[in-house]
Each structure stands twice: as structure tokens, then as C-alpha cells.
């Protein structure tokens, strides 16, 4: 570990930052984040970072305030003469808005990355991007990490085999990620053709694959409102599955997600700690694996 490395955390996921520092056997840097009476953020590094290699850890959920906080921390680091600044974004908010899918809309993920690079980020690190092609939006190194390595030990304990196990992709977008899990586990692969009548609403159109008498593993990059993954679980059980386990890297868990998951046909929900989970979103089926 370089002696010139310093790690700092925003407010979004300090627990993960502390775990990373414990793993690396370094102290988490001193960064003061407070608010003025009108709600404006006040950012100040409480230690010298001149000529240091600075890493800033900040997930962006909820996105608006945490993205602004990240940009202000980045600007403060550059103005404090850090040698390099690496932005570590375990969960990249606005990652789903990666193209113009209808007239008169922004490409929001490009806007966020333009701000990040414009303020001087030297490198960006993120995990299980919803759309990996957004790496091409910037001309600085953009490292795309995968949670699969952290989750694989847990999956091995579940004894999936070629005869009884199948990985089910809940939509076409998650097919590549699901196929990687299926290959690693040596089990078969199935796919759901999902349609979206409107935002945050998904319906199952078709299911391709044999799920009869199988233990089903549903893989996705995130659980937002949980509609997609719960519909996939219903489809799996309707097609003869004997159990359903859901795995997602990012526990966004917005709106009705927790209630849906608690009352779903899913036996276990495994997520990572890329987003800090508040106490009101903890439920019996939930298991959290650290990616630190």
C-alpha cells in the first residue's frame, strides 16, 4: 500500500468506507461535512492532502444530495492540491439513464460523468454498472468492478448443481450478468422476456428455459421497487420451480420494495453493501454481503 494514499468518505455509505479501510489497515481520512442553516453543504478536509493520492468513496443513492456532496468533495480535494483524486462510486446513480430513449430528454449518466471529469477526477471506480457502456463517456480511466467474486463463496454454500440449479435472468438486460453466474456455477440458464408498460412497472411476456423441479437463482444488478424480481419469482414458481433465491448487487429498495419482497415467493434475498441499508429496510429474508 502506497504511503501517499488517503481514503475519505462522504455521508452516503460510511460503513462501507470503514470496512474498506479496515481491510487495507489504514485510517479513514478526516473530512468535515456539515450544513448551513439554509441546508447548503459545507465541506472541509481536516488534514493536509497536498501531493497525496486521494480516494473518495461515495455511493449516489439517494442521488441528488449525494451527487452534489461528491462534487463538492472532489472540488475541495483538487483545490487542496491532491496529487490524484480517484472517485469510488459503489452504486452509480443515474446509471439507467444512459441514452436518449425519447425526444427532449437528457442523457443523465453522461451529465454526471461530465461534471466528475470537469471537476478534475483522475480515475473513476464503480461496481456492476447498469449500463457498462457509460465507461465510454469519459476519457479518464474508469474501472468497472464486479460483485460476483464477493458473492460466489455464499453461493457455493447453497449447493447448486447442474441437475437441480438454474440461473434465471429477469430481463434481457440482466442476461449477460446471469450467464456469467451460470457459467461460474456450472448450471443452466433461463431468461424472461420482460415488458415495461410505464416506468417502474414490469410484466412478464415470455419465459425461455426449463424450471421444473429446479432451485432457481434470479440475478440482477439492482432491486429498485422489486417489481421485476418478484414477477420473475412468480413466473418461476408457476413454471415448476421448487425454490427461488434472489441476488442483486445494489439494494436500492425504493417505494414498495420491502413489502413486495417480504410477501413474495422468494425464499432469500442476497444483496451487497454498495448502498447503506437503513433499519426500516431490514427484513427476515434479507442477507447482506460486503464488497469491501
Regions inferred by a protein language model and the residue ranges of each:
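PRPP-associated nucleotide enzymes
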Residues: 1-292
Amino acid at each position: 500500500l502506497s504511503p501517499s494514499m488517503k481514503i475519505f468518505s462522504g455521508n452516503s455509505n460510511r460503513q462501507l468506507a470503514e470496512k474498506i479501510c479496515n481491510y487495507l489497515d489504514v485510517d479513514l481520512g478526516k473530512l468535515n461535512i456539515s450544513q448551513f442553516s439554509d441546508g447548503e453543504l459545507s465541506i472541509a478536509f481536516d488534514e493536509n492532502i497536498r501531493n497525496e493520492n486521494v480516494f473518495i468513496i461515495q455511493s449516489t443513492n439517494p442521488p441528488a444530495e449525494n451527487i452534489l456532496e461528491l462534487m463538492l468533495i472532489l472540488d475541495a480535494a483538487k483545490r487542496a492540491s491532491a496529487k490524484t483524486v480517484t472517485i469510488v462510486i459503489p452504486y452509480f446513480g443515474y446509471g439507467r439513464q444512459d441514452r436518449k430513449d425519447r425526444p427532449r430528454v437528457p442523457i443523465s449518466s453522461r451529465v454526471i460523468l461530465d461534471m466528475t471529469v470537469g471537476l478534475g477526477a483522475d480515475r473513476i471506480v464503480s461496481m456492476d454498472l447498469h449500463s457498462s457502456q457509460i465507461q465510454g463517456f469519459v476519457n479518464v480511466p474508469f474501472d468497472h468492478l464486479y460483485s460476483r467474486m464477493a458473492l460466489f463463496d455464499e453461493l457455493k454454500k447453497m449447493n447448486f448443481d447442474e441437475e437441480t440449479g438454474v440461473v434465471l435472468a429477469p430481463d434481457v438486460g440482466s442476461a449477460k450478468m446471469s450467464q456469467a453466474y451460470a457459467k461460474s456455477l456450472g448450471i443452466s440458464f433461463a431468461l424472461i422476456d420482460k415488458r415495461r408498460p410505464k416506468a417502474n412497472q414490469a410484466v412478464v411476456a415470455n419465459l425461455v428455459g426449463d424450471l421444473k423441479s429446479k432451485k432457481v437463482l434470479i440475478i440482477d444488478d439492482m432491486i429498485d421497487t422489486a417489481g421485476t424480481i418478484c414477477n420473475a419469482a412468480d413466473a418461476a414458481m408457476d413454471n415448476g420451480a421448487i425454490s427461488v433465491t434472489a441476488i442483486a448487487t445494489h439494494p436500492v429498495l425504493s417505494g414498495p420494495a420491502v413489502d413486495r419482497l417480504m410477501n413474495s415467493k422468494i425464499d432469500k434475498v442476497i444483496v451487497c453493501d454498495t448502498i447503506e441499508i437503513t433499519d426500516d429496510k431490514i427484513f427476515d429474508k434479507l442477507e447482506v454481503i460486503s464488497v469491501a
